[in-house]
């Protein structure tokens, strides 16, 4: 399809959707569906109109170049318009890129220590807090779903729901293995230790996204335990949900209520099943496009935090920042912005722009 034809079809569809919404003949479900479509089309149409307006102004200025009295003014106007066109064209191309349906969603964050013992658990706790601060800076709601500590106040497992607009779009690049290099507080010889933490960021799934049959679930209840293994209450409030077809297991004991723990576990289960479907779809598409930043593979080492050097390096794009204190304080924007630009560049190339 020719580029101009594609633009005309988008504008025509936007006008059609607007007319349907104004007809007063839609069911509530249809109106909601069309409202979502219109919200997606509106920024694309705005980019199309801005680019077309600039092209029309350019043509008008060029037409005046043959008029001796208007030539100087036309040349000035033409220079101004041509200076804006590259940015308008780039914005239009970005607007036309295929959208990840999950980008606008809230997200579920999961953090676990991997290699490195107690030091990995301590860094996992620090990273969990860093994402909490990043969420607060963005005005998102950070709700702890599960927070299990080890014996040295490190983290055995942390889960949180991060609610807000475009949370997944910003945090999806964080999935993977995060490596930390530093001297542990218990190290008397001053030797640098290397530890790793795994981070998973999943788009929050609604019940309509994933079908979970009760017959496919095994629900076990047990007494919640603390860091040392001791029982912390006398009732069986902890819940373990096993999805037998997939083998996915979710255990939850953060709440004192068995009902609340089960609801949280089901929320995590839906997100993991939804992400599994997305991963299968991504694997199919990956054959056509080698992506450096968009894999979301939690086994991939993506970043190193070197405390003695004050350095954070993202290995996917070879970005190094000597701002470790600020990043651990929740300032991830510079890294995420760079990763976003890299993926946009990959997508633009794949689309032939």
Swiss-Prot record:
UniProt keywords, alphabetically: Cytoplasm, Methylation, Protein biosynthesis
Q: Which residues carry this modification: N5-methylglutamine?
A: 230
Which GO cellular component term is one of those annotated?
A: cytoplasm
GO MF term set: translation release factor activity, codon specific
Q: Which Pfam families match?
A: PCRF, RF-1
PTM summary from the entry reads: Methylated by PrmC. Methylation increases the termination efficiency of RF1.
Question: What HAMAP family does the annotation carry?
Answer: Rel_fac_1
Name the PANTHER family on file.
LD18447P
Please describe what this protein does.
Peptide chain release factor 1 directs the termination of translation in response to the peptide chain termination codons UAG and UAA.
- Please give the family membership noted in the entry: Belongs to the prokaryotic/mitochondrial release factor family.
Q: What is this protein called?
A: Peptide chain release factor 1
Please name the gene that encodes this protein: prfA
């Amino acid at each position: 399809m020719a580029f101009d034809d594609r633009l005309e079809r988008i504008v025509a569809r936007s006008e059609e959707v607007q007319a349907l919404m104004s007809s007063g003949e839609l069911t509530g479900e249809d109106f909601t569906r069309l409202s979502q479509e219109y919200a997606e089309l509106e920024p694309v149409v705005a980019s199309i109109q801005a680019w077309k307006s600039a092209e029309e102004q350019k043509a008008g200025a060029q037409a005046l170049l043959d008029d001796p009295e208007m030539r100087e003014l036309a040349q000035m106007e033409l220079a101004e318009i041509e200076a804006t066109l590259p940015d308008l064209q780039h914005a239009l191309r970005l607007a036309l890129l295929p959208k990840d349906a999950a980008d606008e969603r809230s997200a579920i964050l999961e953090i676990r220590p991997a290699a490195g013992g107690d030091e990995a658990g301590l860094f996992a706790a620090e990273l969990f807090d860093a994402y909490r601060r990043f969420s607060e800076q963005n005005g998102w709601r950070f709700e702890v779903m599960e927070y299990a500590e080890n014996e040295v106040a490190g983290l055995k497992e942390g889960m949180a729901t991060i609610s807000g607009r475009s949370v997944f779009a910003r945090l999806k690049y964080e999935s993977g293995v995060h490596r930390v290099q530093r001297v542990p507080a218990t190290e008397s010889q001053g030797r640098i230790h290397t530890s790793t933490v795994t981070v998973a960021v999943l788009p929050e799934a609604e019940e309509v996204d994933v079908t979970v049959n009760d017959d496919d679930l095994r629900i076990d209840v047990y007494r919640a335990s603390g860091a040392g293994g001791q029982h912390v209450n006398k009732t069986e409030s902890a819940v373990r949900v096993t999805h037998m077809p997939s083998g996915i297991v979710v255990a939850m004991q953060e709440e004192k209520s068995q009902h609340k723990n089960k609801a949280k576990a089901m929320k995590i289960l839906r997100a993991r099943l939804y992400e599994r479907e997305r991963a299968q779809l991504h694997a199919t598409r990956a054959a056509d496009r080698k992506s450096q930043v968009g894999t979301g593979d939690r086994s991939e080492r993506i970043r190193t935090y070197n405390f003695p050097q004050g350095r954070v390096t993202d290995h996917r794009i070879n970005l190094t920042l000597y701002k470790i204190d600020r990043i651990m304080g929740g300032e991830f924007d510079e890294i995420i912005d760079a990763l976003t630009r890299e993926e946009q560049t990959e997508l633009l190339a794949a689309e032939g722009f």
